[in-house]
Amino acid sequence: MEMRNVKGTKDYLPEEQVLRNKIKRACEDTFERYGCKPLETPTLNMYELMSYKYGGGDEILKEIYTLQDQGKRDLALRYDLTIPFAKVVAMNPNIRLPFKRYEIGKVFRDGPIKQGRFREFIQCDVDIVGVESVMAEAELMSMAFELFQTLNLEVTIQYNNRKLLNGILQAIHIPTELTSDVILSLDKIEKIGIDGVRKDVLERGISEEMADTICNTVLSCLQLSIADFEEAFNNPLVADGVNELQQLQQYLIALGINENTIFNPFLARGLTMYTGTVYEIFLKDGSITSSIGSGGRYDNIIGAFRGDNMNYPTVGISFGLDVIYTALSQKETVSSTADVFIIPLGTELQCLQIAQQLRSTTSLKIELELAGRKLKRALNYANKENIPYVLIIGEEEICTETVMLRNMKEGSEVKVPLSSLSNYL
């Protein structure tokens, strides 16, 4: 049998997983500093839930992994963490609002594979339910900047409002049944350009006259400020969108992050669930062209799941761990899983005890030579693993309660008392 991975999946060896764990910890620490509570939801869901009309829309349905259990029930692997979160809130009406949760977990999409994009991947999500104010969006955007600052990645956030975009299409008389198709085309404008948008809408069955209207509208809007849209399009949805965008902009200025954000009137976030603010996060250096995070406001899903059709104001943000890992792996050197490597020279029993003592009395990560390698080979291993310090312990060191401390970076050695070892590290 040929040993190979399923297309779109990957094994992460220890030197890779160390960096991935660092990203997870940075996410968890940042999320918790913003008052978010952890949540875990099942990977396996009812197909009916994952294909719900308020979810990802027709485009996502093509990418869902489906299966049946032994009871012939139709199931699906989750394609995001948003719909499972909405399900949890709908099933638990006693959850106190506002509710801020985070979840880090695997999701699955049978879609195209490219740099930093796989079919099995990890999303790191934060969602807030119970807040109508766009202050929630501003806080999530601020949190994103803080996270990427922690990871030493410079980013910009593009943002828009679906009310503005829907209102523009309404004002130029795009039929309601075609709105979703046009939005999906406009969402690609930065990748395919205005000519590509025209071709895309034509392929979706939109008339040439309507395609010309759409493209001319796009070109006329590119230089407009947020305030200009209300005058350019006499439409109540446009007015609502402008109002929310102006409020958001005020919060971004107050937080000192407005200069790192860009208003993009045709950013759509293709998913049909969004009802207000939408945003996408990009690396400033452009080393990865796709977004490394995204999100927005979706006020209808939880009410639809509960069956009361009430608005439950909800906004979220999602970070792609795999694409962040790809960005960081191009910049960071491999870090070690251990701070100290202990090499016994005929003192295995005592070194086992010393390793245990150091683990229990310090925060150091300790690795003990277990394979019985000679000193030269053991030092070579520590060097290749980027372990910064090695303790060499023979009979003499045991008798004098000392250790030979080797600094692997400098290549220097010094004998130090075991009791004060931490002072030398």
From Swiss-Prot:
A single MF term (Gene Ontology): transferase activity
Gene for this chain: hisS1
Record's keyword annotation contains Ligase: yes
Enzyme Commission number(s) from the entry: 6.1.1.21
GO cellular component terms, A-Z: cytoplasm
NCBIfam families in alphabetical order: hisS, PRK12420.1
Reactions accelerated catalytically: tRNA(His) + L-histidine + ATP = L-histidyl-tRNA(His) + AMP + diphosphate + H(+)
Lineage, top ranks: Bacteria, Bacillati, Bacillota, Bacilli, Bacillales
Subcellular compartments: Cytoplasm
Protein's UniProt name: Histidine--tRNA ligase 1
Subunit comment: Homodimer.
Keywords: Aminoacyl-tRNA synthetase, ATP-binding, Cytoplasm, Ligase, Nucleotide-binding, Protein biosynthesis
Domain of life where this protein originates: Bacteria
Family assignment from sequence similarity: Belongs to the class-II aminoacyl-tRNA synthetase family.
GO biological-process terms attached to the record: histidyl-tRNA aminoacylation
